Amino acid sequence: MQFMGVFFTHSGAIKYHRYLNSLEITNETMPVPRKLSSNCGIGVKFTTDKDINDMITEDIEKMFKIEDNNYMEVYDCN
């Protein structure tokens, strides 16, 4: 499954990128589509079959599952 993490800060996105690298999960930092967030503008896109709930960190504002170029929110910090 493919996901996009949206963050409060650029540093949060970079930390998550490093976190996924430590788990050997291929990921990419990239601009966040405006329809997903107006905060920091940098997100992390990755693919995993692991339980996404175990991969939520305090830096994440929202997490989206990507299917057929559609974004479905699977986590919101609020």
Explain the meaning of each model-derived region.
Residues T48-N78:
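C-terminal structural segments of small proteins and small subunits
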Residues M1, I25-V44:
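Amphipathic, hydrophobic secondary-structure cores in small proteins
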Residues T9-G12, F46-D51:
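Helix N-cap motif at beta-to-alpha junctions
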Residues S11-E24:
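Short amphipathic alpha-helix segments
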Residues M4-G5:
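A short beta-strand micro-motif
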Residues L23-T26, T57-D59:
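Short secondary-structure junctions
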Residues F8, K15, P31-P33, S37, ...:
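Generic, ordered loop/turn and secondary-structure boundary motif
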